[in-house]
């Protein structure tokens, strides 16, 4: 089935091209996995059924309970808020001059050798955007949640159950690409276009590739940040479609990840989806992490890092300060300080898995420890929070964090401003429960 048309799409901008990092040697997408021809028609891209195989976690194929879905979303949001980059992301809602002034103060500190470093500022503006709260990761997670709801809505009611979510994923990405193309068409030049979102380099590049007519897996493979963890944040939410079925969740996560990632970026999404699906199905911490490890090939950087990180974590699992005690080891043996950005899935996913083990699945222990790893604080705390939140449920997230993190600011996806994650979790749980009931 073809998705609805989305209008004329534009080529990626020169500004996007300027962000490109040196490309690693091209690999067969997904280490040999294939969805068919790179330029396959949309109907062929959606044709593959969501697989039924793979090891099953404890529990059944029934819909996940609202408490675990709530824990997943609130844990992710709390982790997102806990990392220092959240304030930078939320500052996007402040007037541009406030961010310019912060940059100027940073330059002043560098040139004058001062150790008083600037932080995001409000000055004479309302400071609400700079208060503790979720930022980009939580908003892209909500984007994935909306996609799930669309898949189980009336639009795709005529499709087989195993194709509905995939059709919704395809529609979501092409709609977004169409919105960006329309914004570019309205601007006198592409660089001055007012875009309807803020996103990772991999997502912007993937959307640009869609705009030129490419299809997955090319949109993720021909991508300067194919290795980042942007798809992992979406993957943990897509896992709600397959509670207790890690392999099926991993396959769905890969389908989505191929729009923006390749290589370790895809492997990381598969791993996080498998772990969360296991947790939603009732698996304990060890089984959930093992489900993730099963998705990571030994020959990959992410596979080697994850195996090593989890081995380190198991040595600290019985210590009262296990997760916090593990931080220096992860900093020195897993986290890389060479590249410009700390968003490689080969680092953030192993960190999240290791801290889940070392904390015994406690969101209150895993998230603060992940936030201590400043290099990967943009997403590792969110990933750790999502998994431990799914393991512990909504009640495991402290009330103060729940209150501070349940409402989205709209700093990455402005249309989501005001979205209540508790209400979204309830809607997801009810929708999936109804679909499960109707399928019996």
State the predicted function of each range.
Residues 2-440:
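Structured, active/binding-site neighborhoods that engage oxygen-rich ligands
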């Amino acid at each position: 089935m073809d998705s609805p048309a989305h209008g004329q799409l534009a080529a990626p901008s020169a500004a996007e091209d300027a962000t490109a990092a040196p490309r690693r040697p091209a690999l067969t997408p997904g280490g040999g996995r294939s969805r068919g021809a790179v330029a396959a028609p949309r109907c062929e891209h959606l044709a593959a059924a969501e697989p039924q195989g793979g090891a099953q976690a404890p529990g059944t194929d029934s819909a996940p309970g609202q408490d675990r879905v709530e824990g997943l979303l609130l844990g992710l949001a709390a982790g997102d808020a806990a990392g220092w980059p959240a304030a930078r992301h939320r500052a996007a809602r402040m007037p541009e001059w406030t961010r310019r002034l912060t940059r100027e103060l940073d330059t002043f500190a560098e040139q004058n050798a001062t150790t008083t470093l600037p932080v995001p500022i409000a000055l004479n503006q309302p400071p609400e955007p700079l208060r503790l709260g979720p930022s980009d990761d939580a908003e892209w997670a909500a984007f994935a949640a909306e996609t799930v709801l669309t898949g189980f809505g009336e639009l795709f009611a005529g499709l087989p159950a195993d194709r509905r979510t995939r059709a919704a994923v395809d529609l979501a990405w092409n709609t977004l690409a169409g919105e960006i193309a329309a914004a570019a068409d309205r601007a006198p030049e592409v660089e001055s276009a007012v875009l309807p979102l803020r996103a990772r380099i991999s997502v912007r590049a993937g959307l640009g590739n869609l705009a030129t007519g490419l299809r997955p897996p090319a949109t993720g493979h021909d991508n300067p940040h194919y290795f980042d963890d942007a798809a992992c944040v979406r993957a943990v939410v897509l896992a709600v479609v397959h509670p207790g079925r890690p392999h099926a969740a991993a396959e769905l996560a890969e389908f989505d990840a191929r729009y923006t990632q390749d290589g370790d970026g895809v492997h990381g999404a598969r791993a996080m989806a498998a772990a969360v699906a296991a947790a939603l199905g009732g698996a304990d911490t060890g089984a959930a992490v093992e489900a993730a490890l099963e998705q990571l090939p030994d020959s990959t950087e992410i596979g080697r890092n994850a195996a090593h990180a989890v081995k380190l974590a198991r040595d600290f699992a019985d210590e009262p300060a296990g997760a916090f005690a593990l931080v220096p080891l992860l900093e020195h043996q897993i986290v890389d300080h060479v590249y410009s950005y700390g968003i490689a899935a080969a680092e953030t996913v192993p960190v999240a898995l290791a801290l889940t083990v070392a904390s015994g699945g406690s969101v209150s222990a895993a998230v603060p420890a992940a936030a201590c790893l400043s290099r990967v604080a943009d997403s590792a705390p969110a990933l750790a929070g999502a998994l431990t939140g799914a393991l512990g449920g909504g009640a495991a997230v402290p009330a103060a964090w729940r209150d501070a993190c349940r409402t989205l600011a709209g700093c990455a996806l402005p249309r989501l401003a005001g979205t209540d994650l508790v209400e979204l979790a309830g809607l997801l749980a009810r929708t999936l429960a109804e679909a499960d009931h109707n399928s019996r």
